[in-house]
Regions:
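Membrane-embedded alpha-helical bundles of multi-pass enzymes
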Residues: 1-177, 374-375, 386-390, 401-409, ...
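Soluble catalytic domains of enzymes that build or remodel membrane lipids, polysaccharides, and related
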Residues: 177-447
Length: 468
C-alpha cells in the first residue's frame, strides 16, 4: 500500500507542492528500481564513478514526472471534493502509465501492475485490459485506504466497498480463468543459455569458442527431440549472412538434430557504410527460411536519439551502437508452427506483441541478452513483464537469454522451468499453442483510452467550474 502516504499528503497540498511531492516520490521509486543502470555504466562505459549515476538520475527524474503529474492532478481535483479526486486517481495513474509507455518512443518499464507478476489470480484480468487493469486495481485499493484517513466515515466506507468489490471481482475472475482447461495443441522447444560474459561476445579470438559452446548445447538438446531450438539475441559472433561457412554449419546442425534453429545475429546490409540490424534468423537444413529485424531499438544502446546534436555520447560507452530498426512486425510461418519473435526489451511494449498475435502468432519467443545487467535486479525485472504478455493473449512465451533469466511462461502467466543467472544450460519443454482470442487481443488498450478520456473530462470539468 505504498501509495497511501502519497495520496494522503497531496489531497491537502496546493497543486505545485503536490506535484513536487509526487515527483520526489516517483524519482526515489525509479532510482531504486533502475539502480542496475549504474552497474551497466560503471562496467561498460568510460564515465567515471560517481558520474555513472547521472544517466540513472536523469531517467528516474523523467519517470518521476508522471507520478508528479498524477499527484498534481489529484490535488487539483481534491479542491471541491477529495472523495471524487481519490475515485478518479486510478484512472489518472493508468493514463499516466500509458503516456509514459508511448511518449518519446516510450519507456513502459516498471509499470505498477508488473509488481504482481507472481500473483496469478490477480494478473488474469490482464486478458481484459492488459497490465493497465492490474495497475488500476492496485491504485484503487490504495486510494480507498487513503480515503479512510482523510474522508468522513461514510465516504470512506463507500470507497472501501467499491475497491473491495473490484478486488473480489478480480480474484474471482482469476480463480475462474486459472481453472479453465489448458490448450491441447503443443510443440516441443529447447532454449539455449550459453552464459557468455558480455566482454567476450564479439572478441575475434573468442569466436570459435562461442560457436563451439552453442554447437555443444544444441547437440545435447537434440537428444530430447525438440522441434525448435532457440538461441539468444546476437548469439552469433559474426554476421550470419556474411559468413557462408557458419551458415552451412548451422544447416548441417539443423539436419543432425532434426529441428529448426532460431538464432540471433547482427545482420549487415549494403556498403559504405553498411546498415546494421539486430535480427533473428530461422534456419533448417534448407538454409535461412525466415528473418525478423528488431523494430524497437534501445535508446542510447542501439541508437542515439537526436544524434546530430548529441552523437558524441557514443564515445562514452562501448555498448552504444548505431543500428537500423526493422520495418515490419513479421510472423514466422514455421516450422514447427506460426510464431513471432520479440528481441530484447521489445516485449515490454504490449502493442507490439498484440500486433504479432493479430498477425497469426500462436507462440511468442523472446530472445535477449541481459548480460549488460550483470548480477543485478535488471534481468529479473525484465522477466517480470513477460507473464503479462502471456496472459494478455493467452499465449505461451519462450525466453532464451544469454546469461539468464531463460524461462518457459505458460498462457496463465505461470513461470515454469527457468534458469539461474550465469548458468550454462539447456531447457526443453512442451509448449502449448495459442488457441483463441482475448478481449485484449481484440480491443487492445481500451482501458487506457477510457482512463485518458475520463481523466481529461474530469480535469476539464474542474477547470470549467472554476472559471464559471
Amino acid at each position: 500500500m505504498a501509495l497511501v502516504p502519497l495520496f494522503v499528503t497531496v489531497v491537502s497540498r496546493p497543486v505545485r507542492a503536490a506535484f513536487g511531492w509526487g515527483w520526489l516520490y516517483g524519482t526515489v521509486y525509479f532510482l531504486v528500481l533502475l539502480r542496475w543502470l549504474d552497474f551497466t555504466f560503471r562496467t561498460y562505459s568510460d564515465i567515471p564513478w560517481p558520474l555513472t549515476w547521472g544517466p540513472m538520475l536523469a531517467l528516474a527524474g523523467y519517470c518521476g514526472l508522471y507520478v508528479g503529474a498524477v499527484a498534481g492532478a489529484v490535488s487539483w481535483l481534491a479542491g471541491p471534493s477529495i472523495g471524487r479526486a481519490l475515485a478518479v486517481s486510478p484512472l489518472l495513474w493508468v493514463g499516466a502509465e500509458w503516456i509514459r509507455g508511448h511518449l518519446f518512443g516510450g519507456f513502459p518499464w516498471g509499470l505498477l501492475g508488473y509488481s504482481q507478476y507472481l500473483s496469478l489470480p490477480v494478473i488474469q484480468i490482464a486478458e481484459l485490459g492488459g497490465v493497465y487493469a492490474v495497475s488500476l486495481v492496485i491504485v484503487a485499493a490504495n486510494a480507498a485506504l487513503a480515503g479512510c484517513l482523510v474522508l468522513s466515515r461514510r465516504s470512506a466506507l463507500n470507497g472501501v466497498v467499491l475497491a473491495g468489490v473490484l478486488l473480489v471481482g478480480t480474484l474471482a475472475f482469476g480463480a475462474w480463468r486459472l481453472s479453465a482447461p489448458a490448450p491441447t495443441g503443443e510443440i516441443r522447444i529447447a532454449i539455449m543459455q550459453p552464459s557468455i560474459e558480455q566482454p567476450l561476445k564479439f572478441v575475434p579470438g573468442h569466436a570459435a569458442e562461442t560457436v563451439g559452446i552453442y554447437l555443444a548445447l544444441t547437440r545435447g538438446a537434440g537428444a530430447e527431440r525438440p522441434q525448435l531450438i532457440v538461441w539468444p539475441e546476437t548469439a552469433l559472433p559474426t554476421p550470419l549472412r556474411r559468413d557462408p561457412e557458419l551458415a552451412r554449419m548451422l544447416e548441417s546442425l539443423s539436419a543432425a538434430v532434426d529441428a529448426a534453429l532460431l538464432v540471433g545475429s547482427i545482420d549487415v546490409e549494403g556498403k559504405a557504410p553498411p546498415k546494421l540490424r539486430n535480427s533473428a534468423f530461422l534456419l533448417t537444413e534448407r538454409g535461412i527460411i525466415g528473418r525478423y529485424d528488431k523494430i524497437r531499438l534501445v535508446p542510447f544502446g542501439e541508437f542515439v536519439p537526436l544524434s546530430g546534436l548529441i552523437g558524441f555520447v557514443r564515445s562514452w560507452a562501448q555498448f552504444i551502437a548505431e543500428l537500423e530498426p526493422g520495418s515490419r512486425a513479421s510472423v514466422f510461418s514455421g516450422p514447427p508452427a506460426p510464431f513471432a519473435v520479440v528481441i530484447c526489451y521489445e516485449g515490454i511494449f504490449p502493442e507490439l506483441v498484440r500486433e504479432l498475435v493479430k498477425g497469426g502468432a500462436r507462440l511468442i519467443v523472446n530472445m535477449t541478452n541481459d548480460a549488460w545487467f550483470g548480477r543485478t535486479a535488471g534481468p529479473w525485472q525484465h522477466l517480470a513483464m513477460y507473464p503479462f504478455r502471456a496472459v494478455e493473449h493467452r499465449v505461451a512465451v519462450v525466453r532464451a537469454a544469454n546469461t539468464g533469466v531463460s524461462a518457459f511462461i505458460l498462457p496463465s502467466g505461470h513461470i515454469g522451468r527457468h534458469t539461474a543467472l550465469f548458468e550454462r544450460t539447456v531447457l526443453t519443454e512442451p509448449v502449448p499453442l495459442r488457441a483463441g482470442e482475448t478481449i485484449y487481443s481484440r480491443f487492445g488498450d481500451w482501458l487506457a483510452y477510457l482512463a485518458l478520456g475520463v481523466s481529461g473530462a474530469s480535469l476539464a470539468l474542474r477547470a470549467w467550474r472554476r472559471a464559471a
